[in-house]
Amino acid sequence: MQGLIQKSGYIKSGGGAGGYAEYIATRDGVELLNRSGQYMEYIAERPRSHGLFTNAEYADLEKTMEEVNSHTAPVWTFIYSLRREDAARLGYDSAASWRRLLLAHQAELAEAMKIPPSQFRWYAAFHDEKHHPHIHMMVW
């Protein structure tokens, strides 16, 4: 995708991956995915609401933090960023649109990272920054 900026890194086992998950899920500017009815109201108003999403319908931040903290191999981190005008032009200016993109390409990403698709795990959060909307993604 033209104009896409990628930054990559990793967190070693025992290196605080759960804290990183909490940071990307709860920092200022994170967008909550729309959910229907009373459940959305519950999500938006409950303590520790977050914008974490994954391939499942709901991402549980506490369970995610426990899972990545107990993971014994590196957790890979990615930031994908676009300029505001490119995000608007391409339609990647919401958490839902980024989630659809990641869902469409998760098998390719698993293959590229040499992770069996059945074992591939990922979580992400969309940060709607003024000049560069972006996602933070964790993969293991």
Question: What do these predicted ranges mean?
Answer:
Residues 1-133, 137-140:
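N-terminal nicking endonuclease/strand-transfer module with a His-rich metal-binding environment
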